[in-house]
Amino acid sequence: MSGSSLPGALALSLLLVSGSLLPGPGAAQNAGFVKSPMSETKLTGDAFELYCDVVGSPTPEIQWWYAEVNRAESFRQLWDGARKRRVTVNTAYGSNGVSVLRITRLTLEDSGTYECRASNDPKRNDLRQNPSITWIRAQATISVLQKPRIVTSEEVIIRESLLPVTLQCNLTSSSHTLMYSYWTRNGVELTATRKNASNMEYRINKPRAEDSGEYHCVYHFVSAPKANATIEVKAAPDITGHKRSENKNEGQDAMMYCKSVGYPHPEWIWRKKENGVFEEISNSSGRFFITNKENYTELSIVNLQITEDPGEYECNATNSIGSASVSTVLRVRSHLAPLWPFLGILAEIIILVVIIVVYEKRKRPDEVPDDDEPAGPMKTNSTNNHKDKNLRQRNTN
């Protein structure tokens, strides 16, 4: 073997050796965590979720275990539906394994250590095996504190009177030091409401439907999770932002929409006027598509038909307080609609030409002179005529 071929042969042998060391598509791979659960502090009545994501070949099995506070060695397995159905376990297996543990309506007894276990060892469920060897573990500590007591005013229903409304919250008991408090509406902090006060008020001077929603008074503490209370401000739907008319050509697609303010979020219904009565759209033709998103609805009609689709459409919003409806007129034009202006101009030109031709034909016989008649009146000597009038007649006798 020549010296020049030695480096190439050596490189090839090294590549083969290294390739044999890498796990192939079907090679076994021990379980490992990609995402492990994180410790949290919660208040009574709240909920928490813990995530566990593992990889391995074959895909590892995932289990959830729990140990009470100060009893870290006394683990018990958690099952879906445990603790009066407050525990939910959702697990999915594919190229990796993912599991979510969720516990709602927390109590003080839910505090403790929660453990995600994963293993793809064939003997992992053999009781003669040591679980600490066949299973890998990731732990999270959940601390549940007593929620502070917050007294709130009653829910409000906005009427047409427009009388001022005052929302009130009072933090009556808390074992933690208050940092600050503020108001939110639908999850958004209201400006100029942040202060360090346990007794909070928010005033709506001229309440309207757009002022309705979920109001929260939120309290932040030095060494505890924030606490909040909810006051619902309700109002009947008020539809805004709709189109009064829509003009489309035959074969095109049409989209009509309605927006509303008011709380709770309404249920939407689309209707079309048939024989003077609004009837709910049945979509028997399969060309109607309705999309509803809380305070927004959309009606789409594809491949418009000039004989079926024109007319008056109505969107209706209804919630527990009241309802509202608005209508939109849909006009569908023929395919020839873009040519109508040109055809109109062409028709005017043709009519004008016909009028001119007819006029010329009627005018020409009157203007041709007759050969038997003199071309003009006879000329006379007007001067001589006047002189003859002044001459006296002489009697020759």
From Swiss-Prot:
Tissue: Isoform 1 and isoform 2 are widely expressed with variable levels in brain. Isoform 1 is expressed in cerebellum and midbrain. Isoform 1 and isoform 2 are expressed in cerebral cortex, hippocampus and striatum. Isoform 2 is more abundant in the cerebral cortex than isoform 1.
One annotated GO molecular function: cell adhesion molecule binding
Region (Disordered) residue spans: 364-397
Superkingdom classification of source: Eukaryota
Region of interest: Narpin: 149-161
Keyword Phosphoprotein: no
Alphabetic keyword roster: Cell adhesion, Cell membrane, Disulfide bond, Glycoprotein, Immunoglobulin domain, Membrane, Neurogenesis, Repeat, Signal, Synapse, Transmembrane, Transmembrane helix
Function: Probable homophilic and heterophilic cell adhesion molecule involved in long term potentiation at hippocampal excitatory synapses through activation of p38MAPK. May also regulate neurite outgrowth by activating the FGFR1 signaling pathway. May play a role in synaptic plasticity. Also acts as a chaperone for ATP2B1; stabilizes ATP2B1 and increases its ATPase activity. Promotes localization of XKR8 at the cell membrane.
Name of this chain's protein: Neuroplastin
Gene source species: Mus musculus
Gene: Nptn
